[in-house]
Amino acid sequence: MNKKLIALGLSVITALTLLSGCGGEKKAAVPAKNDLKVTYVKSPLNIPSIVDKHNQTLVKEFGKDKVTVTFPEINSGAKQTEALASGSLDVCSALGGTSAILAASNGVDVKVVGIFSRAPKAFNIMVKDPAIKSAADLQGKKVAGPKGTILHQILVAALDKANLKPTDVNFVSLGIPASVNALMSGEIDAALVAGSDVLRAQKAGAKVLCNGEGLVDATIVIGVSGKMLKEHPEMVKKYLAVHQQNIDFMNKETEKLMALRRRKPVLPLTR
């Protein structure tokens, strides 16, 4: 996986290089694009997306060019890349690096154009049984979570650190909310959890067994299709510039940001 992460980093450099040089080539005329479909990812809750939704930054900036921005709500990384491949999505605003790697290895033409965040502490393995004190105690247990994601990668890394293999647990592929529900009902022994569902699980009596710190870097990326990058590079550049506006708001408008954080149960975001 480390080699794949290096490849992911190289793909970012490659995509940014393509963007920086997009103005110098003569290309065949491409019809103007008057819409932009950007995922709004709620789980885990991430501050730049919340800031953008509150301030309507993308809508206002692209509106100046008469471009309509819509925000399909897709939390699953796999479903984001599926939508990208089908052409029903233009920008994966917050895509797990693991999901990007798996999609690319399966032939999806996804291009990483930026790093959204790195927040390993936001991704957790949670349990309810007090007898489970470490990853080693997961041997033979049933664990649920979204397959092929950063959370899944953390599970594999935690097991490896405990000298266990992925096959030493009974893994069930479920979404995060369903995994928490299964943990609370006793159907499984451990759940892979992120976002506001961590707080929900804790309120119901679950505890964090471990998080991604020291196991993975938990890179969340911004992805577009190769076609989008090739045909509409200026839109991609503008998207990244507007995203930076949201980051600048986070850094400068501390009081307003805290007010937004109080409205939603947001986990810390490390850039």
Can you describe what each PLM-predicted range is?
Residues 71-82, 95-97, 164, 169-185:
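Short helix-initiation/N-cap motifs at beta->coil->alpha
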Residues 31, 35-54, 148:
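Extracytoplasmic "Venus flytrap"
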Residues 1-35:
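Short, low-complexity disordered leader/linker segments with a strong preference
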Residues 29-33, 127-142, 228-237:
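Flexible hinge/capping segments at coil-to-helix
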Residues 98, 171-172, 177-265:
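Pocket-lining segment of extracytoplasmic ligand-binding domains
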Residues 43-73, 78, 102-106, 153-160:
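Short, polar/charged alpha-helical segment
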Residues 31-37, 60-73, 88, 161-173, ...:
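A local structural motif
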Residues 85-95, 108-110, 141-142, 184-193, ...:
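Alpha-to-beta junction loops
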